[in-house]
UniProtKB/Swiss-Prot annotation:
Keyword annotations from UniProtKB, A to Z: Iron, Lyase, Membrane, Metal-binding, Plant defense, Transmembrane, Transmembrane helix
Protein name: Indoleacetaldoxime dehydratase
Classification via Pfam families: p450
Gene Ontology CC terms, in alphabetical order: membrane
Protein EC: 4.8.1.3
CDD domains named among the record's database cross-references: CYP71-like
GO MF terms, alphabetically ordered: heme binding; indoleacetaldoxime dehydratase activity; iron ion binding; monooxygenase activity; oxidoreductase activity, acting on paired donors, with incorporation or reduction of molecular oxygen
Family (UniProt): Belongs to the cytochrome P450 family.
UniProt xrefs under InterPro entries: Cyt_P450, Cyt_P450_CS, Cyt_P450_E_grp-I, Cyt_P450_sf
Segments passing through the bilayer: 2-20
Protein origin, superkingdom: Eukaryota
Length: 497
């Protein structure tokens, strides 16, 4: 009996010591964790998110600081809301933060991350990014498609001329979706989506993929609520959309294999790389589909959102509109002719306008999440491996400590002599991200946006119908991964030719 009691006492003491050690270890670690709002059991801080998370996260950061730790259910989330904090994440420790979180949507829609944007950080991602940059997104390649951009911008201008002659309004939001879609479709597939059934179907599938990527699958953060994703059809949607996209791309690739066309589009280029056994990296047929998908997502969404917000802000700011019109119209020779990309290169105020729009309205207000691969210290805080990271670019680019008390105002003049570029060197301005995961298609998006705005503003005067905000379009944001306007931008063009 005494032996049993002794053994029980020893076991109890051992278990107590082990639990105490674990508790002390966890407590010591927690001492250096970033500030955190109080969280609820099971759901963590999910109740503190609004339909516009970039706004609610900014509000929390104003209270808890530019580096804070939240929990979305069981998942720790590091939220970065200042350029100084972003410096450590995107520069100092970039290689540790370069991975992507695994998600059901990415796994199902992107074949487990076989593209460039969502691929896990590693050799495959490095090789795929290299193939993309060296073969599809070089300056020479972007310049080679200038005629495509000119054709499509001119087609849009013709529609606006007709609206002007009949004094009717035009849905600019719709035009700004069609324009980059047609350009990307011709560049990537060799066909125009508005004139080709397969390309139209592909555009529809890409939009569905973006919508699914922007949804919030509660089951990934709170496993006991995974049944909700099933009931609302999220899992079935992923399977259906993925299958539809894959079938369409199989058809596109097969048509390219059978065609004898001297004009090489992106699919042709990738197929030639696939056939080249001496390229050093073997591109698989399946990989081609998802590289093209990246081109559509980046080439259409970023540009359409940028154009929509640019015209919104210019119409709201008559002084800025007049200043830009003066710059552009003094350049046009002969008056009213198409403004070419070479002419746009020297338009300083136009470039300042685009920079300011991207500051206030980055296409992705929160840079695509990253995943920490190993334990690290950030600004003196302990951050554990497996933590997901959200960089709130929208909050960083409206920081009054950096941009001044007028940070919320549209003021292109602040960029005329700023020296800022789009490559993420200054972490207070990161509309396309920074570091290893920076958007590789910057030149593709900007080239089309700049020449489009130049022709829209140079060749037309603009007005909107008076509404609740008078004669100014409102700034209400839609809900989604890419934050466009909630309501379409309807405006009246008046030709000045």
């Amino acid at each position: 009996m005494e032996m049993i009691l002794s053994i029980s006492l020893c076991l109890t003491t051992l278990i107590t010591l082990l639990l105490l050690r674990r508790f002390l270890k966890r407590t010591a670690t927690k001492v250096n964790l970033p500030p955190s709002p109080w969280r609820l059991p099971v759901i963590g801080n999910l109740h503190q998110l609004s339909l516009h998370p970039h706004r609610s996260l900014r509000s929390l950061s104003l209270r808890y600081g530019p580096l804070m730790l939240l929990h979305f259910g069981r998942v720790p989330i590091l939220v970065v809301s200042s350029g100084e904090a972003a410096q450590e994440v995107l520069k100092t420790h970039d290689h540790k933060f370069a991975n992507r979180p695994r998600s059901k949507a990415v796994h199902g829609l992107m074949n487990g991350g076989r593209d460039v944007v969502f691929a896990p950080y590693g050799e495959y991602w490095r090789q795929m990014k290299s193939v993309c940059i060296l073969n599809l997104l070089t300056n020479k390649m972007v310049e080679s498609f200038e005629k495509v951009r000119e054709d499509e911008v001119n087609a849009m201008i013709e529609k606006l001329e007709k609206a002007s002659s009949s004094s009717s309004s035009e849905n600019l939001s719709e035009l700004f979706i069609t324009l980059p879609s047609d350009v990307t479709s011709r560049v990537a597939l060799g066909r125009k989506h508005s004139e080709d059934e397969t390309a139209r179907d592909l555009k529809k599938r890409v939009r569905q993929i973006m919508e699914l990527l922007g949804e919030f699958p509660i089951g990934e953060y709170v496993p006991i609520l995974a049944w909700i994703d099933g009931i609302r059809g999220f899992n079935n949607k992923i399977k259906e959309v993925s299958r539809g996209f894959s079938d369409l791309m199989d058809k596109v690739v097969q048509e390219h294999l059978e065609a004898s066309n001297d004009k090489a589009d992106f699919v042709d280029i990738l197929l030639s790389i696939e056939k080249d056994k001496n390229s050093g990296f073997q591109v698989q047929r399946n990989d081609i589909k998802f590289m093209i998908l990246d081109m559509f997502i980046g080439g259409t969404s970023t540009t359409s959102t940028l154009l929509e917000w640019t015209m919104t802000e210019l119409i709201r700011s008559p002084k800025s509109m007049k200043k830009l019109q003066d710059e552009i119209r003094s350049t046009i020779r002969p008056h009213g002719s198409y403004i070419k990309e070479k002419e746009v290169e020297n338009m300083k105020y136009l470039k300042a306008v685009i920079k300011e729009v991207l500051r206030l309205h980055p296409s992705l207000p929160m840079i695509l999440p990253r995943l920490l691969s190993e334990d690290v210290k950030v600004k003196g805080y302990n951050i554990a491996a497996g933590t997901e990271v959200i960089i709130n670019a929208w909050a960083i680019q409206r920081d009054t400590a950096i941009w001044g008390p007028d940070a919320e105002e549209f003021k292109p003049e602040r960029h005329l002599d700023s020296g800022l570029d789009y490559h993420g060197k200054n972490l207070n301005y990161i509309p396309f991200g920074s570091g290893r995961r920076i958007c590789p298609g910057i030149n593709l998006a900007l080239g089309l946006a700049e020449v489009t705005v130049a022709n829209l503003v140079g060749r037309f005067d603009w007005r909107v119908e008076a509404g609740p905000n008078g004669d100014q379009p409102d700034l209400t944001e839609a809900i989604g991964i890419d934050v466009c306007r909630k309501f379409p931008l309807i405006a009246f063009p008046s030709s000045v030719v």
